[in-house]
Amino acid sequence: MFCSFGLFLVSTQQQANAAAVDKQTQTQLHDYLKSHHINGVILVNGKGSQAVTIANNETTNKKKIVKANRLFPTASLQKIVTGTAIYQLTQKKQLEWDTSLNTYFPQIDGSEDITIRELMNHTSGLVNNDRPAVPLKGQKQQIAYMLEHMRNDHVHTWDYQDVDYELLAAIISKQSHSSYNAYIHRNFAKPLHLHQIKDFSEVAKKEVPQPMDPAVDWHQVTVTTSSDFGAGNLFISPNNYWKFIYNYVLKDPKMITEFYQESQKQEVAYFGGVYLMVTLSVLTVVFQVTMLALSLITRPRK
């Protein structure tokens, strides 16, 4: 196990305020971290919609201690950022859910049969699980690698593939006539005052909590993040990620409702980077816990 970060939010469709997590639940979450020897943090909603950090340290090594204001690799938690950016473009009438991938990448096999909607809900049929030998340098190289190594299974059923969101990031860049990273900074980081967000290429090793597993080195981290363009290339502190979710995502109940409605059209209730479900008329948005080589919570080796 390397690192991970999970964010769980509950919001009604009428009111975009996450419910506060009570003290008993906070204690239970801390007990879970401790009993499973997880070195990390969990952020939950507190009074006044402020983030409450629940932390557990399994080491005294300062290089490995996880903090809420320290950069971490977002891994698949970045997908909601990319999905939200795509939603913005639909609201500006710059693209639609039914817009064909062929509009942007006609060179991709079967692109005329793949829509933005299918990229958002992982039913495109596209697959790419390859990793480069060395970190990719810049967006141009990231897109070129993605296009070279993807394949189309021509089966439009649920298949969780990062390549879907890599393509969405490339579409954001093409549609906005700027780089993907520039779009994210201009539309999210700057207005929300997110100062702890960087592309992998800007991050120094010392800025990130190091894995407890000595088998995972910085080279692996940079290789993986560099090839997860739009789906894990950004490093964000838990606090800044919280600000994005609470001050942007949950402030837009229209977007959450639309994501929910779209998610119900397939076997897995997923759309725009999140799993969604309704329980007792409450829309529950679950921001997935990602157990990948780039996460935030670290476990000691046994």
Features from the language model and the residues they span:
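Short, surface-exposed beta-strand/loop micro-motifs that present aromatic residues
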Residues: L43, H156, S281-L283, M291-K302
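A short, well-structured edge-of-sheet supersecondary motif
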Residues: H30-K64, S281, S295
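Active-site-proximal loop and beta-strand segments within enzyme catalytic domains
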Residues: T60-Y160
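Short, surface-exposed loop or secondary-structure junction motifs
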Residues: I114-L280, T284-F287
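Sec-dependent N-terminal signal peptides of Gram-positive bacterial secreted proteins and lipoproteins
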Residues: M1-A18
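Ser/Thr/Asn(+Pro)-rich, low-complexity disordered segments
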Residues: Q14, A18, T284-V289
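Extracellular/periplasmic catalytic domains that process cell-envelope and extracellular macromolecules
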Residues: K34-H36, I65, G110-D113, R151-D153, ...
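Short N-terminal segments immediately surrounding and downstream of signal-peptide cleavage
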Residues: A18-S35
